[in-house]
């Protein structure tokens, strides 16, 4: 484990060194008047995305370490109802109470599924955690001038959509879709450490968290780089101009949410800036789709789950969000 962490640390150091050399090298003269301003903006956006996401990723990997060392498969099986319908509801409701963003929730779900949680239950947790947790709903309420309508619609429609997607995943996938095998999560787990003293178990928890952080961190960086590139070099107005009519504007706002990869605790303030330009349905597309799926989150999901599963989940989220919002439009 230490060897792996050290190798990841070397990789991070190498990447950081390359970026520093690129930034400070005096010989760079590629269209300097344009390049310097654009690169400075790119740099600021990239750092802001990392600063937004890192606290939640750190929280996520710490919880992942606790699950790995202190939670056994037997304890986990008692938590999830055997009835699939109840399990779907339970996973979505528990996720809704957990203050995590779409980045921090990925390592937690990977650990839970790896320890024996049904895949569909993990998906329910994955979808509702970043979307309708108390912090997100409160920030939505504040962003729209203390108007409860958008906040309530985000919560209710988001929960309905998450349950629908979870049910479809339950029907489509019966096997574990993690890239790592189940045994990879059981080594040095609670069954082997139950008789060991607490300090030893705490050390194991921290080692697991560090290993998880370096494993997920590089994919967060890749996603943040791509999202920063989009925000810097692609004008938001040019994206919005693509939308025409209710369906078009909703699809454009969903696409914008995917590309911008905003933290779910802050995305409502961006959506509120379009309040007088677009219908509420389109704004809800931005608010619901983004926390479920965005660019940096997709990179992290691809590092954890099999490609076919991630693509299927992407299609299900996109189609379900759009369909439910269009059906609910007369009531919005």
Describe each model-derived feature in a short phrase.
Residues 2-7, 87, 146-192, 300-332:
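Juxtamembrane and boundary regions of transmembrane helices in multi-pass small-molecule transporters
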Residues 21-29, 66-72, 162-188, 208, ...:
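Transmembrane helix exit motif
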Residues 7-14, 56, 86-90, 149-157, ...:
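Alpha-helical transmembrane segments of integral membrane proteins
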Residues 1-42, 193-217:
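Hydrophobic transmembrane alpha-helices of multi-pass small-molecule transporters
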Residues 97-156, 235-309:
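Membrane-interfacial helix-loop connectors
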Residues 55, 59, 72, 102-106, ...:
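Alpha-helical transmembrane segments and their lipid-water interface positions
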Residues 30-99, 103-106, 202-259:
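Membrane-embedded alpha-helical segments and adjacent helix-loop junctions characteristic
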Residues 10-26, 62, 162-165, 318-321, ...:
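Hydrophobic core of alpha-helical transmembrane segments in multi-pass integral membrane proteins
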